[in-house]
Every structure is written in C-alpha cells, then in structure tokens.
C-alpha cells in the first residue's frame, strides 16, 4: 500500500467531474486500499478519489466507533453512487482534507438513500442519516467537482477566502 498526495483547494483538479468506474480489477482494488491508508493517515472520515487525483466515481467513508477508533471492516467503499431518495434538512459543521484547517456549518439532507457498487461491482442500497448522510453527500459532491465551501453563504465564503489569504501569506502558520 502507498500513501497518496491529497490535493488542496484551490487546485482546479478538485473541480473535475469524475467518470464512472468500469473496471473492478486488481489495480482498482489497490487504488481503494491506497485511498483508505491515505484517509486514515490524514485523520479523515471520508475521501473521494478526485482528492488524490483519480477522476473516478469512487469514495470511502470510515466513521469511528464509540471508542473513537476507525476499523477497516467498517469502511464503506462506495463506487458509482446515485441518490435514490433524500429527506429533511440538517445543519452540520464540516471540514475537508482538501481544505485543511477550515470548518463551517453547511446545510445538507438529514437522510439519504443511495444505490452504489462495492469493490466487486455488486449493486447495493444504503440508507443513511445524520453524520453518515452528511459524509455521503460531502463526498458525492467531490465526484461532481463541488466543495463544501461552495455551499457557504456569501458572508461565510468571504470569511473563508480571507482566512485562506492569511494562511497563504504566512505559510509557517500551516499545520
């Protein structure tokens, strides 16, 4: 396995609309494994392939258990996802591995139902609510070239741009 480089905002790569996965071969499985290793090493709970430069409709979500530990067997590998149903509304504070150090409240659907394929191309259906629903929406947005900062109000977006400018002026402040 290998750690992959996470692409950061404002890279244009993050605006790429990802293509359907058609080959579920050994190379594809290795990409999923490398993505998982990268996500865990970066202390993330989700990662879309485009965030590591792969323009493919695949994402991972690995929520920690009550003890705060992320177990690989809990990792959702979601390939070629499609929304079937969405319900309700929830405000949730989000962050992103591609936008490090910035967290802001974003409005999302409270519940989602998706159809997707697993690593073996088997079609599955998943119903999710709260944090899992938010994470799914966040990562699917990445597959469509959308970042959570795009969903901010004008005021919050200006705050984000100002913080980003300050961070870029003083790179030693980066964590």
Swiss-Prot record:
Cofactor: binding comment: Binds 1 Fe(2+) ion.
Required co-factors: Fe(2+)
Any single GO BP term: co-translational protein modification
Keywords of this entry: Hydrolase, Iron, Metal-binding, Protein biosynthesis
InterPro entries: Peptide_deformylase (IPR023635), Peptide_deformylase_sf (IPR036821)
Residues of the active site: 139
Enzyme class: hydrolase
One Pfam family linked to the record: Pep_deformylase
GO MF entries: metal ion binding; peptide deformylase activity
Domain of life per record: Bacteria
EC code(s) of this entry: 3.5.1.88
Binding site for Fe cation: 96, 138, 142
Catalytic activity annotation: N-terminal N-formyl-L-methionyl-[peptide] + H2O = N-terminal L-methionyl-[peptide] + formate
Family per record: Belongs to the polypeptide deformylase family.
Function: Removes the formyl group from the N-terminal Met of newly synthesized proteins. Requires at least a dipeptide for an efficient rate of reaction. N-terminal L-methionine is a prerequisite for activity but the enzyme has broad specificity at other positions.
The name this protein goes by in its record: Peptide deformylase
Designated gene of the protein: def
